[in-house]
Each structure stands twice: as C-alpha cells, then as structure tokens.
C-alpha cells in the first residue's frame, strides 16, 4: 500500500505523487493536496510545498466537510515546517 510505503520511505517523491493521484481518484482532495506537497518537499522544493499546503489550507477553510479537521491540522503543522525549511533554503542561496 502506498500509505505504508510513504511512512517507511518519506523522501520517496514518486510514492507521494502516486498517493496524491490515488487520493484524488478516491475523492479525497485535501489529502491529495497534502501528498502532493510532501512530494515537492521530498524533492527539496520547499517553496512549492508551501504553495500546495496553502492551497490545502484554503480548501479546508472553505470545505463544508468537518471530517477534514484532522487533515487540516496536519497541513497547518507541515506548513509551518515547510515555511521554516524554505526560509533556510532561501538564505543559503
């Protein structure tokens, strides 16, 4: 299973991207966006990860589905982490 794979290999960008596609097909757009962000982060493209996570925040805010609460919390936490990494990355350039 892809979810098990990304837990074991969190830097596997391809697995995250495949998981994103599967989640989109399963009508889980918020989880799909987070998986896409994780794929970007695995490629060290933290700015793109921040962009995807912000899109996820916007989607969560506008979603009538309250079941997305836990995923929204994960997105908020990961966004802070990615913003910090993006800032460090920009400082090194």
Where are these regions (language model features)?
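Alpha-helical adaptor scaffolds
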Residues: 1-25
């Amino acid at each position: 299973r892809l979810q098990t794979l990304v837990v074991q290999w969190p830097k596997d960008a391809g697995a995250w991207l495949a998981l994103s596609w599967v989640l989109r097909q399963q009508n889980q757009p918020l989880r799909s966006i987070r998986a896409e962000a994780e794929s970007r982060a695995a490629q060290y493209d933290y700015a793109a990860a921040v962009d995807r996570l912000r899109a996820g925040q916007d989607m969560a805010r506008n979603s009538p589905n309250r079941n997305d609460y836990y995923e929204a919390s994960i997105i908020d936490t990961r966004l802070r982490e990615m913003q910090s990494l993006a800032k460090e990355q920009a400082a090194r350039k």
